[in-house]
Amino acid sequence: GYLGVDMMVCRTEDGFRVHPCVEINLRMNMGVVSRLITDTYLAPSVQGWYVVEHYGADGEALEAHKQLSAAHPVRLTADGRLQSGYFSLTPVKPGTRYQVYLQVEEK
């Protein structure tokens, strides 16, 4: 929905505890974003993954981007919707450490 509830994991003497509600924000959360992406950009007969990836060193993201692009090339429908493939939603450069991408395949 349009309300985001932030939580927090806290270290205590006994281990970890979850604080279930630190704050509530009016914002587009990932459920809304994924629904908008699906309805606007994906072909109806596909399934996909919205991935947020972290890379530990410079160059890792760029290498992964090259491998995924080669292994899963983008295919579009006649009306321009994503039918299958890997599609980066963020720029990937030599110093990139975080990346968001879609990976889509036919059901």
Model-derived regions: residue spans:
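ATP-dependent carboxylate activation and anion-phosphoryl transfer catalytic cores
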Residues: 1-107
